[in-house]
């Protein structure tokens, strides 16, 4: 299957050419040996810089009139109808792409994606889903920033999406997965009233698969396969983990084995998936360096090839709206 992947070159904290270099590395890797077609979305000045690059013969370039900056309000982002982000999502909505990757403004990407891409009808609200390495493999966490304030019903929806995601990527249809609610303590009485109600609902719905409240340290130990949280708490947790890993990488330097360095580089792999959409949208970190972008783009190709969004929708047994 040929994967048609769109990449937004604009809006991140890095130079757009860093994205271009990551694309080149993907095409030179074993991933690039499989059928893949890249379309990048960039402003005219960036397009001009790319014209003499040998890579331009292998990548389609779409010129955008503008781009969504990190400082743009949601209203400003929505008004930029011909931004690189908007054009990429339009192409995805029209079926010209199998997936879209952006390092741009998170709130704008979630809002624009939700307005342009049909949602799975059983999903109450989209969530940013990430995979993190654990002692037993990996765990998925959602939400990590799509929505700051959510209610218990929406948290249960996140749990269902996380479970559907794990099941959709598993080769064993009967493989059991466990869930935990990220909280300030493991006791049932801990947390806000919303957390307590969410705890009761998750226990009633998922039974023994729900292992109760978990603390931040439990995530990397591999205690559960799916971590459920609101966007505010999840985002703080994720950025704290990123900061810690970056600190360790800087302190230990060459003393880290190569395999461990790879784990740190791909802490968010393949970026944050906007789960709940019927089509694949990946949000890479705005500060992603070349190696992390390589991982995000490569992971997006793998997920598109696996038809992960269709599989999640099938798990919900529902149509899209």
Which residues are covered by each model-predicted region?
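Glycine-rich phosphate/nucleotide-binding loop
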Residues: 113-141, 222-227, 231-321
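Glycine-rich phosphate-binding loop
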Residues: 91-110, 190, 195-201, 205-261
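N-terminal phosphate-binding or glycine-rich loops at protein starts, especially the Walker A/P-loop
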Residues: 1-47
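Flexible, glycine/charged-enriched surface loops at secondary-structure junctions
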Residues: 33-36, 169-179, 208-217, 258-259, ...
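Short glycine/serine/threonine-rich phosphate/pyrophosphate-binding segments
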Residues: 15-20, 49, 81-92, 99-113, ...
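Phosphate/nucleotide-donor binding subsite
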Residues: 54-97
């Amino acid at each position: 299957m040929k994967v048609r992947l769109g990449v937004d070159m604009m809006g991140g904290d890095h130079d757009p050419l860093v994205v271009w270099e990551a694309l080149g590395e993907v095409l030179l890797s074993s991933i690039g040996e499989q059928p893949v077609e890249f379309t990048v979305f960039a402003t005219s000045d960036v397009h001009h810089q790319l014209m003499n690059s040998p890579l331009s013969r292998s990548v389609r370039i779409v010129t955008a009139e503008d781009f969504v900056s990190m400082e743009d309000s949601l209203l400003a982002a929505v008004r930029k109808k011909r931004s690189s982000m908007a054009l990429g999502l339009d192409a995805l909505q029209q079926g010209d792409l199998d997936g879209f990757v952006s390092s741009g403004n998170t709130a704008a990407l979630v809002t624009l994606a939700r307005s342009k891409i049909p949602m799975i009808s059983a999903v109450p609200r989209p969530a940013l889903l990430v995979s993190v390495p654990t002692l037993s493999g990996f765990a998925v966490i959602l939400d990590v920033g799509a929505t700051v304030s959510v209610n218990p019903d929406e948290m249960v929806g996140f749990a269902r999406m996380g479970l559907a995601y794990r099941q959709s990527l598993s080769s064993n249809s009967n493989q059991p997965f466990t869930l935990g609610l990220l909280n300030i303590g493991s006791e049932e009485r801990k947390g806000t009233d919303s957390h307590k109600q969410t705890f009761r609902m998750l226990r009633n719905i998922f039974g023994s698969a729900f292992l109760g409240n978990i603390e931040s340290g439990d995530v990397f130990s591999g205690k559960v396969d799916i971590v459920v949280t609101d966007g505010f708490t999840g985002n703080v947790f994720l950025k704290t983990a990123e900061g810690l890993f970056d600190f360790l990488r800087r302190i230990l330097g060459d003393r880290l084995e190569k395999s461990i360095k790879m784990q740190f580089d791909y802490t968010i792999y393949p970026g944050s998936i906007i789960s709940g959409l019927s089509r694949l949208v990946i949000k890479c970190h705005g500060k992603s360096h070349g190696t992390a972008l390589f991982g995000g783009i490569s992971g997006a190709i793998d997920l598109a090839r696996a038809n992960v969004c269709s599989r999640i929708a099938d798990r919900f047994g529902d149509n899209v709206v």
